[in-house]
């Protein structure tokens, strides 16, 4: 359950109530090897690494995917209150430093072919509030392609080494739209990104899909 407020184009206070919710009841026994074997990609969310039971399920799914040749992706999706480092009323908060969260994320980053997050989400994954330093820290533990979302500025991709500037990555511009509701922006972005990535499109085209889907999501209510 989410209680969402909309103050203006930049403030969306919300309260998460996620006590004993269905997705956090996921366990290893729920992971069907046959289902994973039929998948082209397994995408995990960072939230499900926050609890030992769901983490075990995620790790099993990733192991099966990698053994079967499927691609693996991580949406860092860092929500401090869902990791227990912020209160229920801090649902709008996107970043709280936590060595515990950073260590947990870094212990799994090597399992992914693609890692996606905002600058703040890479800060928690990399253990630094300097975006480039955070990306470099992630690169030391993972060879994944890194996709950094930059809101209205679009997104930038780092397939290999991290350059001296964010602007030196493979960039995709955002779409100028009126923002109504930011909830669902990340899900929309991932959907567009997967459409291009899984079909072997080039990064400019893939980022155009991703940014367009994210823009559609935030430009309407509901």
Where are these regions (language model features)?
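Conserved beta-alpha-beta core of the PfkB/ribokinase-like small-molecule kinase fold
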Residues: 41-137, 144, 152-155, 160
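Conserved phosphate-binding/catalytic region of the ribokinase-like
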Residues: 63-67, 100, 127-222
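Short gly/ser/thr-rich secondary-structure transition/capping motifs
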Residues: 20-29, 94-99, 128, 172-174
């Amino acid at each position: 359950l989410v209680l969402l407020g909309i103050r203006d184009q930049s403030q969306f206070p919300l309260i998460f109530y996620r006590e004993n919710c269905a997705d956090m009841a996921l366990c290893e026994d729920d992971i069907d090897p046959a289902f994973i074997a039929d998948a082209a990609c397994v995408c995990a969310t960072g939230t499900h690494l926050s609890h030992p039971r769901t983490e075990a399920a995620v790790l099993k799914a990733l192991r099966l995917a990698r053994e079967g040749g499927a691609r693996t992706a991580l949406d860092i999706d860092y929500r401090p209150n869902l990791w227990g480092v912020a209160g229920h009323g801090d649902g709008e908060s996107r970043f709280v430093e936590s060595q515990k969260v950073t260590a947990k994320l870094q212990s799994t980053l090597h399992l992914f072919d693609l890692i996606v997050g905002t600058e703040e989400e890479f800060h928690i994954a990399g253990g630094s509030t300097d975006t480039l330093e955070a990306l470099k820290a992630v690169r030391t533990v993972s060879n994944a392609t890194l996709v950094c979302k930059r809101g209205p500025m679009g997104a930038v991709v780092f397939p290999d080494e991290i350059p001296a500037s964010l602007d030196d990555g493979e960039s995709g511009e955002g779409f100028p739209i009126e923002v109504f509701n930011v909830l669902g922006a990340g899900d929309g972005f991932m959907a567009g990104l997967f459409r291009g990535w899984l079909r072997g499109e080039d990064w400019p085209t893939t980022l155009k899909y991703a940014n367009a889907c994210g823009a559609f999501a935030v430009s309407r209510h509901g």
